[in-house]
Amino acid sequence: MSQPISIQFTRFSAFYSPLIATIAGGFLKEEGFEPKYSIAPLGKSAIAGLADGSVHVAQSAPSQGFAPLEKGEMPPAVHFAQINEKDGFFITARRPDPKFTWEKLKSGRILVDHGGQPLAMFKYACFKNGLDWKSLPIVDAGIDKMDQAFRNGTGDYIHQQGPAPQQLEHDGVGHVVASVGEAIGPLAFSSLAATRQWLATDEARRFTRAYRKARAWLIDTPARRIAEVEASFFPNIHRDVLTQTIATYQKLGCWTRHVEITRPAFEVTLDVFQHAGLITRRHKYEDVIAQPPA
């Protein structure tokens, strides 16, 4: 008899394909699990589900551990495996611009995702490109409304996670001109989180074994085949768009072979959050990160 396992996403997109493929590709079923997944309500982290016991594994980010640490409290969960080792957001313009530079953002209004981590990363990417983000004509159209606002004519640029930018390209509304992940480089961006108690179980070891297999498959498999497997998870996304998005993330190097969240990657995330003024000190790796169950 299959064992139920509950997985919750904080956000849901093709960017999280390593976890989606673990479900869609049958890797969890091979380990005796019957997976069910959900998406946390907008503005709520999936970490809350771990804390109340309704969720076994959450798609989250190591930075979620910073808020309780800033208050002198230990986080209710730890992050034990990476999903993405680079930011997965893009800058999309209304017209193709093969000579785009970040400096051009000064001359056009840009709709920016104002979620905590996406905004911090955008600020840091601007910094890395010699820009003060405060000098930019930024528009906050709302995370769930910004895509339609751009389609309706608001702004000259938009900052989004895939597959939204690729869908804009497919629809003839925009053209991707830059990658935030490319601007910043490797860091601890998105991850799998669980409680320390759950990570000590055989269930956690079996889950991690399935996740390692899914991740290797994702790296070695053509994007079109991955899109076929994941298509039912994205009923409103054109198959070609899903394929292009997955291929873009493969090429960008978001999905590396190791599942561990490395110390160097974590240190860069601390750099980003210090730059954004969201943390007052550099938190310990061990307070946020755990090693994957063997």
Residue ranges and their predicted role:
Residues 1-2, 294:
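Basic/polar N-terminal segments that are highly enriched at the extreme N-terminus
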Residues 282-294:
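Hinge/cleft segment of the Venus flytrap/periplasmic-binding protein
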Residues 2-131, 137-140, 156-162, 173-178, ...:
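Short, glycine-/small- and polar/acidic-enriched structural segments
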Residues 107, 170, 290:
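Phosphate-coordinating loops and pocket residues in cytosolic domains that bind phosphorylated ligands
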Residues 200-280:
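Secondary-structure end/capping motifs
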Residues 20, 63-66, 123, 166, ...:
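Predominant activation on well-ordered alpha-helical scaffold segments within soluble catalytic domains
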Residues 145-233:
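Pocket-lining segment of extracytoplasmic ligand-binding domains
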